[in-house]
């Protein structure tokens, strides 16, 4: 009988995608299960969050909702962890009801022992919001 081997790079990518799906649905309790102790999210401008609820509260005055269209996931094995890069665009609705779309983003995740250690976020949302105000 052949034993199936799970590719660790594919597994890391799938963990990130499942986490992103739960975050998009704002199922924070389920999303928390993907996180390693000490997990941190770092957003543009150096804004750092260690609690998902804190990030969700921070986002409330920025937009009503946001979703991601994924272009690709790139995965690289490091010496102590796997790094998953997620590329795409954001779309959603500002708090005034105006729709937005095509906002570029890149997220970089560090995955170790099947858990997310950190997430670094880069996007053009702040630049677009500044133009609208």
Predicted features, each with a name:
Residues 1-37, 132-133:
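Short, low-complexity N-terminal intrinsically disordered segments enriched in polar/charged residues
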Residues 6-10, 50, 100:
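Residues at secondary-structure transition points
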Residues 19, 30-32, 39, 51, ...:
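Hydrophobic pocket/interface hotspot
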Residues 28-82:
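A solvent-exposed, acidic/Ser-Thr-rich amphipathic alpha-helical stretch
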Residues 35, 90-92, 123:
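Short beta-strand segments enriched in hydrophobic/aromatic residues
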Residues 80-90:
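A short hydrophobic beta-strand element
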Residues 89-113:
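Exposed beta-sheet edge and beta->alpha loop/turn motif
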Residues 104-132:
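Short beta-strand edge/turn micro-motifs at domain boundaries
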